């Protein structure tokens, strides 16, 4: 009897606790609930409408819309949903703070993005992200002029749209802008869009097949991070140029770009640079004068970034550096971290290359196969091995698809590893990937031979990592 009473008391407490929690939620004002729903993807926010009658239309009052067209049965259903949502917002005189759309449309699908953006482009809009799936340039939708005067806009990402001519830009709060594979009225308007954002800090520009931006000028007094990427196959290469003038720029990423000329001015704030993928500068020419111009251009470019402390470069950028700056290459005295890809035939130039980084502490090498392996001779010892290098990691790449492979014991890799441990005076760690994780491979003769390398540094450890 007593036990039953205790159970009943516990049950009553549980029910009361549940009711208290339910009452707590129900006591929240609609404005707070809609703010909570704002942080959900719209598809998930809509599902809350089944909770109760009160929740049935609360999601319609959220100040944000995040939708993916592929989540709907077809494109027309997607358009109808967005139109109804914006229609409700218009009737209730609501202003959206955020609009994020990921759209996949065909050539015959109706245009709608222009009018949607025009509706949400109010002084209260803070976040706009529009991505339209790969489509022909004839299907690109035009950005309305109203967007260029959103005074509260903080974040802007535009993908596969058309930016027409405009008379003025007023985006006083915009800090992050990403322009990806769009069409621009002309190069001057693109330059103006970038330079007239007074607090812009983060800019990403991805070139596309239709943008026809032969000269990209990035001028800003506030920019701290810049990303430029994309394969610009349709450029007039002889006249293509990227000019960067950003006094506060700290991070620069150039990836798979083919601009003939690259100029960086006022680069004193740069700390990290990535030169990735296909890195191109001026076609080779038999004309000695043209070849001299290219050497000067490449030398000036690397000199302009020589103050960085962290750099990552592709095999193409490495080749450009070796062929066009030696023997008077710029010194990267502040550089402590370097990651570089190298084709195996170019490995013999590695010591000379490393001489440009006298205070290097960390080195990551990605090896790329190109021709059959040959005898590797490394005799010269650069200054950084004798004074500063503490960490080395060697990564391998397959010959066919350039993907990383697991290896130990290959002649070139063995000699390269031996070169570092025998010549680095303060090396703390050498990291090598295993060719196999089987016990037979791990405890093979080659494995133990690596561990028995004579080491110039008494504190050097050799580490194997499976699966790199």
Curated annotation (Swiss-Prot):
Q: Which CDD domains is this protein grouped with?
A: F-box_AtFBL13-like
Classification via SMART domains = FBD (SM00579)
Fetch the InterPro entries from UniProt. Answer: F-box-like_dom_sf, F-box_AtFBL13-like, F-box_dom, FBD, FBL13/AtMIF1-like, LRR_dom_sf, LRR_FXL15/At3g58940/PEG3-like
Task: List, for all copies, the residue spans of the domain called FBD.
Answer: 375-433
Using the record's annotation, list all stretches that form the F-box domain: 22-68
Q: Check the record and name the Gene3D superfamilies matching this protein.
A: 1.20.1280.50, Ribonuclease Inhibitor
Name the domain of life this protein comes from.
Eukaryota
Protein's name in the database? Putative FBD-associated F-box protein At5g22720
Please give the organism. Arabidopsis thaliana
């Amino acid at each position: 009897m007593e036990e039953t009473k205790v159970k009943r008391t516990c049950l009553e407490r549980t029910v009361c606790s549940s009711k208290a929690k339910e009452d707590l939620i129900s006591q929240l004002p609609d404005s707070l609930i809609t703010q909570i729903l704002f942080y959900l993807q719209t598809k998930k926010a809509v599902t809350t409408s089944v909770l109760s009658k009160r929740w049935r239309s609360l999601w319609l009052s959220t100040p944000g819309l995040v939708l993916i067209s592929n989540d709907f049965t077809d494109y027309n259903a997607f358009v109808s949903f967005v139109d109804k949502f914006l229609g409700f917002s218009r009737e209730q005189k609501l202003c959206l703070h955020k609009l994020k759309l990921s759209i996949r449309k065909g050539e015959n699908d109706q245009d709608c993005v222009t009018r949607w953006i025009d509706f949400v482009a109010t002084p209260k809009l803070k976040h706009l992200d529009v991505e339209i799936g790969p489509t022909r340039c004839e299907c690109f939708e035009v950005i309305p002029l109203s967007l260029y005067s959103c005074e509260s806009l903080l974040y802007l990402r535009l993908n596969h749209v058309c930016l027409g001519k405009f008379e003025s830009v007023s985006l006083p709060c915009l800090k992050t802008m990403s322009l990806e594979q769009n069409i621009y009225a002309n190069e001057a308007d693109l330059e103006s869009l970038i330079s007239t954002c007074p607090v812009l800090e983060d800019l990403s520009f991805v070139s596309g097949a239709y943008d026809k931006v032969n000269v990209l000028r990035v001028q800003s007094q506030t920019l701290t991070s810049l990303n430029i990427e994309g394969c610009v196959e349709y450029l007039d290469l002889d006249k293509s140029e990227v000019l960067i003038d950003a006094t506060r720029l700290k991070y620069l990423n150039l990836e798979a770009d083919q601009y003939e000329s690259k100029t960086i001015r006022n680069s004193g704030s740069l700390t990290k640079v990535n030169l990735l993928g296909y890195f191109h500068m001026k076609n080779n020419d038999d004309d000695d004068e043209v070849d001299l111009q290219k050497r000067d251009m490449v030398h000036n470019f690397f000199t302009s970034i020589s103050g960085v402390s962290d750099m990552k470069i592709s095999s193409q950028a490495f080749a450009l550096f070796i062929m066009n700056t030696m023997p008077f290459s710029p010194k990267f005295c502040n550089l402590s971290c370097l990651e570089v890809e190298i084709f195996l035939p170019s490995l013999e130039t590695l010591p000379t290359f490393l001489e440009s980084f006298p205070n290097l502490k960390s080195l990551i090498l990605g090896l790329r196969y190109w021709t059959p392996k040959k005898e590797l001779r490394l005799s010269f010892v650069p200054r950084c091995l004798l004074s500063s290098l503490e960490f080395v990691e060697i990564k391998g790449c397959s010959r066919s698809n350039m993907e990383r492979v697991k290896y130990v014991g290959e002649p070139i890799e063995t000699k390269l590893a031996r070169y570092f441990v025998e010549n680095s005076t303060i090396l703390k760690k050498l990291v090598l990937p295993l060719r196999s994780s089987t016990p037979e491979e791990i405890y093979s003769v080659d494995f133990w031979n690596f561990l028995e390398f004579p080491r110039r540094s008494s504190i050097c450890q050799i580490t194997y990592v499976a699966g790199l």
